[in-house]
Amino acid sequence: LLVDEYAKRYLPEDTARFAYLLSRLKKSMTSLLCYLRDEQKQSCFHPAACELRIGSGEDAVPGQVYHLSDGRTVQLVGTVDRADEWVEENGTRWVRVVDYKTGTKKLNLKEVYCGLDCQMLLYLFSLTRDKSGRFTGAEPAGVLYLLADPAPKTTNRQQAQQDVQYELDGLVRDEQKVFDAMDADETGRYLPFGYRNGVPSPSQKDKRADIAKLNRIQLHLDDLVTQMGQQLYDGQIAAEPLVAGAGKNPCVWCDYGFICCHETGIGERALEAPAKPFEPEETENEKEGEQA
């Protein structure tokens, strides 16, 4: 009803195509709102802020400041779609970052290791490093990508008439109480992994990280941002795109190819990351034990 009133007042165009697009938008909005309602009803995490600014200004969370070797600095700025908070009975505070995406999204730690898809993790660590604001002392619970407008799938008519199944991706703190706080009934609908025989799926272990692993990710990203900042100040901006794999060449959708004149296949970098990024290095004894 609200959408119809708004459209009538501000969008007077009345064509068959417009009517179809409007009906599709209403259906999508209704489905998403119902999903968010159901998720909030069972979750211990609740929105603490939406469109939360990181950087400077009123109501903003201070962005992390990175100090370079020559005395210059780099400051993180941005906007968090949604920051959720959970406070335990003992006073322990947890914070998670939620990002709404369209289409598909998969968080790949190998890509994070190389400097891709770092945004939400950098935002999370800025919140947990907040020394005097609303998130002071909060523990990192993770980052979630909510596919708010899933890419269309080929399916039969009966399945197409069912409710949209929203998918989550991301990285969550590897503690059972955090899982329960996000997905009380262990349905797998509200976590980036499912359950198998009553336990988190072993095949989706890369969607979970204990505090030690999160700390390693944080330190690695600190080094990456510092390195990037130094290179920018030094004028090192060669057109050498990082191609993460087949179909992942960033030049395909870049609007500035006519400026850098990059030629596909020339001067491109490939992913160079450990097989298990951010995991502790195995000792010789551990390697021998696995081989035995």
Spans of features found by a protein language model:
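Structural signature of nuclease core domains in nucleic-acid processing machines
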Residues: L1-A292
